[in-house]
Amino acid sequence: MVEEEFMNEFLKKTGYQVYKCKKCGERFWSLVPRDTCPDRPCSKYDFLYNEYKGVPPLTFDEARRKFIEFFTSHGHGYVDPYPVLARWRNDLYLTIASIIVFQPAVTEGIVDPPYNPLVIVQPSVRLEDIDNVGLTFGRHLTSFEMGGHHAFNKKDQYVYWVNETLQYAFDFFTKIIGIEPENIVFKESWWEGGGNAGPAYEVLVDGLELATLVFMKYKIVNGKKVRNPVLVVDTGYGIERIAWFTQRTPTAFHTIFSSLLETYKNILGIDEPPYDVLKKIVYLLSDKEIEDVYMLNKYLEEIDYSEYYKSLVDTINLYTALDHVKTLSLMLSDGIVSSNTGEGYLARLVIRRLLRTLIRLGIKVSTLEDIVLELIDKQAKYWKGRYVYDKFHRRLDYILDVMSYETRKYIDIVTRGIREVDRFIKKKKKITFDDLIQIYDSKGIPPEIVVERAKHYGQEIRVPSNFYSLIAARHGGSQALIKEKEHELPDEIVEWASKHDPTKKLFHENPYLRRASAKVLDSLNEYVIFDQTIFYPRAGGQDHDKGYVILGNEHIPVKHVYKVGEVIVHQLATKRRLVPGTQVELVIDWYNRYRLMRHHTATHIVLGAARKVLGEHVWQAGAEKTVEKARLDITHYKSLSDEEIRKIEELANKVIDERIDLKFYFLPKFEAEKRFGLRIYQGGAVYSPILRIVEIPGWDAEACFGTHVYNTSEIGGIKIIKAEKIQDGVIRLEYIASTRLPEYISDLQKEVDKALKFLGAKGLPISIVAKKVSEELDKYKTLLIQYRRLFKEILLKHLLEEALEICGLKTVVIEKQLEDEQLYKSIIEDLSLKKRVLTIYVSDKFVEIAIHPDEANNRKLDLRKLVEILQNMGGRGGGKPDHIYIKIKEPKQIVKLIVEAITNLLCKA
């Protein structure tokens, strides 16, 4: 069935006719007869050699400017680009297209767009095709600009649809870019993404797709197409491709990076094939699907250009480096923190692929860090003052710091990883694709190293050409982020509450209100909904209020408070039904509430302080505010120093001393974003037309549901009591505020007094006592070393005197339980390595057996065979041919068996 959007009037009126491509079988519209569509692989990049008299060459910046000017002159409001880190979404990590800015809030009619229609040129990042970067000479990029003009049609507001969209595309490409109408083809297509779908047209000119025009009329619900409440025009014009088309350079990289490409060639020592040769190769290969360098070599042989294979492979790696450095600069300058989860994982994936690419280009590990930092610096200089890319320069210190840290980490992983890979390969008879992913995910070791090591063991492994693309897809932008559940209400209660009108939130109107009257709207079991409430529910990491409901002379405790949409549900301590319409009094525990208010405001202050001390990349990764303390998880790539913690605390307390009045606003979504920036989404995405903004002027502003003090001075003071790295890329700060401070100090003093009393030094300064204890410990450590050495000499002499002789090999069995781990390990080492004695150490829980590697080799002895024997007796362990360790129950009872087994092994050997 042909979608109605493909039966449009504009194309017919303009003289376009429908044709069917003889190669791909798809329908397309053209002004001139054609057998095939001008889309690869049905056609080559004919644009590279065609003469377009009316098409002047445009730079990347000029192509963007012309696109914006055309649509603003046609009544479209201009929207500034958003970051590539999609903080306003809870189902995506990265901004993969311009429509992402408006999904799902605008596309589903929840929120009105800032303008209708609108135009935006959105830098985007897609990693699903990362392995194709370079190989396709610019058709695939990990970061690119998507020019989008969007219209949102509702029942009561028609803006424009198919005919107008096609008219805009036709006019832009003919009147602004200067392409002859006969060269422009509209190919029918279908598009899905971000939960929406619809028919589409691809705008093709001589082998290059310049734009896609999508008519988003469906949303995908449980895998099925459902009519969308808003008909969305979603267009994507490739700004880089438009510039490439007008310049007709051999690759898109020459157009995008221009002089920077030459700079990178000099730094990396790369020579491209001659310009004309490169252009010819790109043209001849443009209708081929090249998945890897092996296929590249095959096709070069077919077109008689195989002599350029080595040069072309290096050139492709050069293009990859250019692309990846730009993408990383985008990701990091927008605040992504490299880690092993979420968007941080994706950043690290690009970083490590870049590093591997540079190593393939012959960069030595010893100079890798310096080269990476130079490439980053040159990229920042190239983009300085140009569109959003100026932030590369502004945030260069952070980008360089992260890249330096990640490069050193990668070198360490690769260096240590060889041994781990060797062990893994020895265990596995055949390395699978899942094994490669496991090694990469758990150890960070790239598949290329596994391949190299496997060759030493006679294994041939072929890494899928799209390995990194598959990795990106597994961890990528389309998967939902894990969100903490705010409550565990029964489904029936959630369904019941959802049917009611929003509760009036008195705790927002006046958070200092301790008592208020309310009317019962409904109740079910112990759950009650009032028309209004002063009780704050558990939400946004803040604990719920405590208190009670006064019904006549009865005081009913409130056990828990929940938020279901805009309805506040109160759970009473007893199961009882309150009659709808009944008037009650609500009373909160003010002591509890006020502490929560101060801890919540303290959290906003600490977050602002952390950002000022550590950098703009700091973002809230989680938070909890309780009566006892508060915690804030922040994104940061390394542990905090004592000095950094001190500075954060000092800045936070300065804000308290400045006695700043907080401000509270209820603003439309896009107005809030424009006024305060996307940092308002510290607590995650908010899908609401109106946002509640809590501002500490000059310090912090966030979309926040919580209760706060009116002035920062009410907090009294903030003390950070703990700072730790809880996972890669996340630091947890724990702190207390207000009246918790004297309690904390009192608790600390009690612990100090206990310690001093235990040491018999009550009343003395703890630093003096600690110094004295430390000095005494050092003295006893020295004595212990001397005694250990003396005891070891005596024990070694005794053990050697009682040594067994097994087939000509001196053997010592140690059945004495040595609680001193350092001593027993030293004895095993001395006996096995220095004395060349087969050593069997038997403790209460394990057996450890060691021999000099040369002795094991000369006698063809493999101690691991003992592991197999002991595993049959319930033992667990492993090791090397010359050293094994086995945990086993009651090992002393099988000493005789162990000796017999060793005797059999030795005598047979």
Swiss-Prot record:
Per UniProt, the enzyme's principal EC class comes to ligase
Q: What is the protein name given in its UniProt record?
A: Alanine--tRNA ligase
User: Which Gene Ontology MF annotations are present?
Assistant: alanine-tRNA ligase activity; aminoacyl-tRNA deacylase activity; ATP binding; tRNA binding; zinc ion binding
Supply the alphabetized keyword list. Answer: Aminoacyl-tRNA synthetase, ATP-binding, Cytoplasm, Ligase, Metal-binding, Nucleotide-binding, Protein biosynthesis, RNA-binding, tRNA-binding, Zinc
What reaction gets catalysed by this protein? tRNA(Ala) + L-alanine + ATP = L-alanyl-tRNA(Ala) + AMP + diphosphate
Lineage here is: Archaea, Thermoproteota, Thermoprotei, Desulfurococcales, Desulfurococcaceae
EC number(s) recorded for this UniProt protein: 6.1.1.7
Q: Which SMART domains match?
A: tRNA_SAD
Against NCBIfam families, the record matches this protein to: A-tRNA_syn_arch (TIGR03683), alaS (TIGR00344)
Family of this protein: Belongs to the class-II aminoacyl-tRNA synthetase family.
Species this protein is from: Staphylothermus marinus (strain ATCC 43588 / DSM 3639 / JCM 9404 / F1)
- Any one GO biological process: alanyl-tRNA aminoacylation
Q: Which cofactor does it need?
A: Zn(2+)
Where does the UniProt annotation locate this protein?
A: Cytoplasm
GO CC terms for this protein? Answer: cytoplasm
* Keyword tRNA processing among record annotations: no
Co-factor binding details: Binds 1 zinc ion per subunit.
Residues that bind Zn(2+), according to the entry?
Answer: H600, H604, C704, H708
Q: Does the entry feature the keyword Protein biosynthesis, yes or no?
A: yes
Domain remark text: Consists of three domains; the N-terminal catalytic domain, the editing domain and the C-terminal C-Ala domain. The editing domain removes incorrectly charged amino acids, while the C-Ala domain, along with tRNA(Ala), serves as a bridge to cooperatively bring together the editing and aminoacylation centers thus stimulating deacylation of misacylated tRNAs.
Q: Which SUPFAM superfamilies match?
A: Class II aaRS and biotin synthetases, Putative anticodon-binding domain of alanyl-tRNA synthetase (AlaRS), ThrRS/AlaRS common domain, Translation proteins
